[in-house]
Amino acid sequence: MIVVAAQAQMPGVSMNLPLKIISTDFDGTFFAEFANPPVPDELQRLIQRLQTAGARWVINTGRDLSSLLETLARAHLCVRPDYLVVVEREIYVHERNRYVGLEDWNRACAQAHEELFARVRTDLPRLMAWVNERFDAAVYEDSYSPFCLIAENNSDADIIHDYLNDYCARVPSLTVVRNDVYARFSHAAYSKGTALSEIARRLSVGPDLILAAGDHLNDLPMLSREHARWLVAPSNAIALVKDAVRKQDGFVSDEPHGHGVARGVQFFLESAGVAETSLNSKT
């Protein structure tokens, strides 16, 4: 069930953990669709123990809300995220067995996108024509963006991405959000990173107490010391993500997906002097 609250009340977090917020991308990072299980049991148990000790877990994804909730239900996890960031910008908090939209943030986000997209709408036919004349790609509009792309392959997506970036450079606040062959226009002020920091602001948690894990281009805004001190990339992350994480003294695992995330969380807990066995072990 999804409801909207004017101002969701967020309880404070325990003060005895070096990680107060764990923000994970979903597909390819926390969740591996073709793995069995899609989320390693060890990662689920680790997150569960951290939550019991007072940490908050955020799934930070490009999926829309219905798609994410459906996949979570089918995965039969033993843990539940405290917060959801969907389509890289909308925030929901778990309260009383339901996810409640943060109305003030989500309303401002929707208004900012509406105003921005109104400014670029007259240019869209030209942009779509440029893509369609050169590539076998799907270009379309949905409820989240007037320009969405599914390229045939990553090489085509790279070229189209460069073209769109050149256009965005001439339009204040416009950016391209990309994951693999998928891309769409978005407002630069609303990203995985700014949404994570908004959650942290409401919880009175600074970036030094936040861990973020991701694998692809749309994760780069949150894989930044501006938003999180502890940065993690699994072995399946693309090279640009691994480079960004390494340059900020983050952890690049030699294991993929959820196993890699677990290694990263364990590494930073140990670096901060917290042994995993010292967490609540009843779960």
Per-region residue spans from a language model:
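Short loop/turn segments at strand-loop or loop-helix junctions that form parts
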Residues: 22-27, 87-89, 144
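Asp-based phosphoryl-transfer active-site loop
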Residues: 18-35, 223
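Structural motif
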Residues: 21, 83, 209-211
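Active-site phosphate-binding/coordination module
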Residues: 39-136
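Conserved acidic, metal-coordinating active-site core of Asp-based
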Residues: 125-213, 217-226
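N-terminal amphipathic/basic-hydrophobic helices that include classical n-h-c signal peptides
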Residues: 1-14
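Mg2+-dependent phosphoryl-transfer enzymes with acidic/Ser/Thr/Gly-rich catalytic loops
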Residues: 17, 185-186, 193-283
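Short, surface-exposed amphipathic charged segments that create phosphate/polyanion-binding patches used
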Residues: 95-104, 191-192, 267-272
